[in-house]
Amino acid sequence: MMSLACAFCVQAGDEIVFTTVLENPITPVKNQNRSGTCWAYATIGYIEAELLRTTGKVYDLSEMFVASKDYVDCAEYHVRMHGNSRFSEGGSADDVLEVINRHGICPEEAMARPGSMIGDTLANFTEFFTTLEPYVESIAKGTSTKLTTQWKVGLQGILDAYLGKCPETFTYAGKQYTPKSFAQALGINKNDYVSITSFTHHPFYEQFVIEAPYKWRPRPSWNVTLDEMMTTIDQALKDGYTVCWGGDVSEDGFTRTGLGIAADIEHAPDLTGSDAARWLKLTKAEKAESLKKLGAQTPELVPTQALRQERFDNWQSTYDHVMLT
């Protein structure tokens, strides 16, 4: 498998044809299915790509191990905050690095496969989180004046029932490991990885914690200019590295046809003037269909530092999906 940076052209009939301009090796893509664990799948994929780059070996690491450990950490934090924080399926790349640092990691084969505890072949958190979230909230916002530790037993029971038990020891390639010793053997060090971002509401060339609902761990990012951020990403890809990044899939220009479009509605054919006003009244599905028809011919906005900041401030652009490039 390869991590692709692509350019595209349009052939007759508006068929979108992608041309590969750069490809870096990655492990096979996995399906998060009906689980809000893009953060775990994308970042584990990134770690696997790093191991492939540095060792030449293909590893299949367990996303559910990471999810289980992270939900314990997040639940404990949520309870300490008396419910005044966020507890949900979502997370960030920071969570994966911190889980590996604190708890280690295991291969996929050492733990129950995603979905297998409920008879599915892929992760499905529909029943799981409608059980887990109210349980944690009932503790965090309960009426108790003194908590016992038994709530943690119940929490772990729910996690084990739906995700499977995290192994204390396991055998891999003929050797016995703990999750911590396995992470050490792989050489995974969270301090080897740098997070960068670009906003003007904080000084450039300083670190700050991005204000996003899913980022409950206070791991900071370096703030650089937009041009410097993109130059850094481009250079990393050219040097053979992959990039794990957080973005927005809730905007109208996100499609499932391989295109992410920052549509310039004012200059889009059939969407100008009164049609532009009509555009604002369309449902999300109707907007998606309009963009699908225009495809690669859709006029796009030119991203600027000011536009990025404006859309972050007014909630048009949010941090709601983690991906691997």
Q: What kind of feature is each model-predicted range?
A:
Residues 1-7:
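Bacterial N-terminal signal peptides
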Residues 12-323:
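Catalytic-core signature of thiol
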